[in-house]
């Protein structure tokens, strides 16, 4: 599943080609995504100029002069730029054609993504309850410490809760907890302020570096320019269960936490 760095990589790849451009038409080949694509999307968006391409958590917000297209990549989706009129392949569900001659093409083999229309996106039901962005000053270790008090939930699903902080998905939670030396099974409420301060620093560092590296390509992700991400080449623990720890050589353990696979080092993480 594309996580925050992959979505931000997509945003950075497509924004320069969309912002300031006028939409000539929208072609919807299959509206059956997680939620149906609005039947009148072509009418609503065609003729409008795209003002800005923003991101909130893992949602891309394509802001037009009136209204915003809210897009989520789901489990296997991607948005990339192609020449308008390029014949579509299987699973290429939507083209947003621009007057420049390019088209923003949405591909989603598993159809778990979304393309929704809103006149007030930040108060949309999918966005209004989201926590702070991890790479802003609104998120820090103090927030993690305060929100964790009295929580018996394991720390890994706690930091993956979008009400606590957005965009810390399975890959980056696994890596950040390793970097901070915290066992992902520990109760969130039993972790000290000092360790949460360290964890917040590592979350910010790892997310920022993953964005710089173009995200993590495991199976389906490609950026808006059609290129894969390269952060997967530098993963310390995610997806490496049963292999030696890159720091101490101890065999990494793989467990299930909150219905997600989690890998950790029993020596480095306490």
Swiss-Prot record:
Q: Which CDD domains match?
A: EcFpg-like_N
Question: InterPro entries annotated for this entry?
Answer: DNA_glyclase/AP_lyase_DNA-bd, DNA_glyclase_Znf_dom_DNA_BS, Formamido-pyr_DNA_Glyclase, FPG_cat, MutM-like_N-ter, Ribosomal_uS13-like_H2TH, Znf_DNA_glyclase/AP_lyase, Znf_FPG/IleRS
Keyword annotations for this protein? DNA damage, DNA repair, DNA-binding, Glycosidase, Hydrolase, Lyase, Metal-binding, Multifunctional enzyme, Zinc, Zinc-finger
The record's annotation in SUPFAM superfamilies points to: Glucocorticoid receptor-like (DNA-binding domain) (SSF57716), N-terminal domain of MutM-like DNA repair proteins (SSF81624), S13-like H2TH domain (SSF46946)
User: Example GO molecular function term?
Assistant: zinc ion binding
Asked if the keyword Metal-binding belongs to this entry, the reply reads yes
Q: From which residue to which do the FPG-type zinc fingers run?
A: 236-270
On the tree of life, the source organism's domain of life is Bacteria
> Is DNA-binding among the key words of this record?
yes
Q: Which residues form the active site?
A: 2-3, 58, 260
- What EC number is given for this enzyme? 3.2.2.23, 4.2.99.18
Q: Where does DNA bind?
A: 91, 110, 151
Q: Which reaction(s) does its UniProt entry say it catalyses?
A: Hydrolysis of DNA containing ring-opened 7-methylguanine residues, releasing 2,6-diamino-4-hydroxy-5-(N-methyl)formamidopyrimidine; 2'-deoxyribonucleotide-(2'-deoxyribose 5'-phosphate)-2'-deoxyribonucleotide-DNA = a 3'-end 2'-deoxyribonucleotide-(2,3-dehydro-2,3-deoxyribose 5'-phosphate)-DNA + a 5'-end 5'-phospho-2'-deoxyribonucleoside-DNA + H(+)
Needed cofactors: Zn(2+)
A biological process from GO = base-excision repair
Q: Tell me how the cofactor is bound.
A: Binds 1 zinc ion per subunit.
What role does this protein play? Involved in base excision repair of DNA damaged by oxidation or by mutagenic agents. Acts as a DNA glycosylase that recognizes and removes damaged bases. Has a preference for oxidized purines, such as 7,8-dihydro-8-oxoguanine (8-oxoG). Has AP (apurinic/apyrimidinic) lyase activity and introduces nicks in the DNA strand. Cleaves the DNA backbone by beta-delta elimination to generate a single-strand break at the site of the removed base with both 3'- and 5'-phosphates.
Q: Which NCBIfam families match?
A: fpg, PRK01103.1
Which family is this protein grouped under?
Belongs to the FPG family.
Subunit text: Monomer.
Q: What is this protein called?
A: Formamidopyrimidine-DNA glycosylase
Q: Which organism is it from?
A: Pseudomonas savastanoi pv. phaseolicola (strain 1448A / Race 6)
Coding gene?
Answer: mutM
């Amino acid at each position: 599943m594309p996580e925050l760095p992959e979505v931000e990589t997509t945003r950075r790849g497509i924004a320069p080609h969309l912002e300031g451009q006028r939409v000539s038409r929208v072609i919807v080949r299959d509206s059956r995504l997680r939620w149906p694509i609005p039947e009148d999307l072509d009418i609503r968006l065609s003729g409008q100029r795209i003002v800005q391409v923003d991101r909130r958590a893992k949602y891309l917000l394509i802001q037009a002069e009136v209204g915003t297209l809210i897009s989520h990549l789901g489990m296997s989706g991607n948005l990339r730029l192609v020449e308008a009129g390029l014949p579509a392949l299987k699973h290429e569900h939507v083209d947003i054609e621009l007057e420049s001659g390019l088209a923003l093409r949405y591909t989603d083999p598993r159809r778990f993504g979304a393309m929704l229309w809103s006149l007030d996106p930040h108060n949309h039901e999918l966005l209004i309850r989201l926590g702070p962005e991890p790479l802003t000053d609104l998120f820090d270790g103090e927030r993690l410490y305060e929100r964790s008090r009295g929580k018996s939930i394991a720390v890994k699903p706690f930091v993956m809760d979008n009400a606590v902080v957005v965009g810390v998905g399975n890959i980056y939670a696994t890596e950040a907890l390793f970097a901070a030396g915290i066992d992902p099974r520990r109760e969130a409420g039993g972790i000290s302020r000092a360790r949460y301060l360290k964890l917040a620093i590592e979350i910010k560092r790892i997310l920022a570096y993953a964005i710089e590296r173009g995200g993590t390509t495991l199976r389906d992700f490609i950026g808006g320019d059609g290129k894969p991400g390269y952060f997967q080449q530098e993963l310390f623990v995610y997806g490496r269960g049963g292999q030696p720890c890159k720091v101490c050589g101890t065999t990494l353990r793989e467990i299930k936490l909150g219905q997600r696979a989690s890998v950790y080092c029993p020596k480095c993480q306490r």
